[in-house]
């Protein structure tokens, strides 16, 4: 059975309350609950991790090297700033899909660049919470 890790970056713990015009009204808990149901259907193990701290995300990626087959990551604000998370993903060489609830290319200019997209298997942006479900489906397909 494949192991898939979902990583959510800073402020995503505030989903449902924070800027619903950009991020929707679902909470992160709602999104993860839906993913867990889908993971059961796909017969994969799903692990969830959220942190507002860059170093904690780096450490979780590093510990994934031994038992995780695929990563789905929404780096949130770290998308545009974190060489450290990029280096961690590059080091472990675990395939990953980058997910964004909003379309980062329709936002402020500083939000349009990602430090991860060129390393990712794919990028899903602007589709809201369903983007996570699409990423999980794609991860399962890529692991076949």
UniProtKB/Swiss-Prot annotation:
Domain of life from the UniProt record: Bacteria
GO biological process, one term: amino acid biosynthetic process
GO MF term list: 3-dehydroquinate dehydratase activity
Active site: 23, 100
Keywords from the UniProt entry: Amino-acid biosynthesis, Aromatic amino acid biosynthesis, Lyase
Site (Transition state stabilizer): 18
Binding-site list for substrate: 74, 80, 87, 101-102, 111
Reaction catalysed by this enzyme: 3-dehydroquinate = 3-dehydroshikimate + H2O
The protein's Enzyme Commission number: 4.2.1.10
Pfam families: DHquinase_II
InterPro entries associated with the record: DHquinase_II, DHquinase_II_CS, DHquinase_II_sf
Subunit and partners: Homododecamer.
HAMAP family cross-referenced by the UniProt entry: AroQ
Protein family (similarity comment): Belongs to the type-II 3-dehydroquinase family.
Protein name as annotated: 3-dehydroquinate dehydratase
């Amino acid at each position: 059975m494949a192991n898939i890790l979902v990583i959510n970056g800073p402020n995503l713990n505030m989903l449902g309350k924070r800027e619903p015009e950009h991020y929707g009204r679902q909470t992160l808990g709602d999104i993860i609950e839906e993913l867990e149901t889908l993971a059961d259907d796909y017969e994969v193990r799903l692990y969830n991790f959220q942190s507002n701290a860059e170093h904690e995300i780096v450490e979780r990626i590093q510990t994934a090297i031994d038992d995780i087959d695929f990563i789905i990551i929404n780096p949130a604000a770290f998308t545009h700033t974190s060489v450290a998370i990029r280096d961690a993903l590059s080091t472990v060489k675990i395939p990953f899909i980058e997910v964004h609830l909003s379309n980062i290319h329709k936002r402020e200019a500083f939000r349009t660049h990602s430090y991860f997209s060129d390393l990712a298997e794919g990028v899903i942006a602007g589709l809201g919470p369903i983007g996570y479900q699409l990423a999980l489906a794609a991860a399962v397909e890529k692991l076949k």
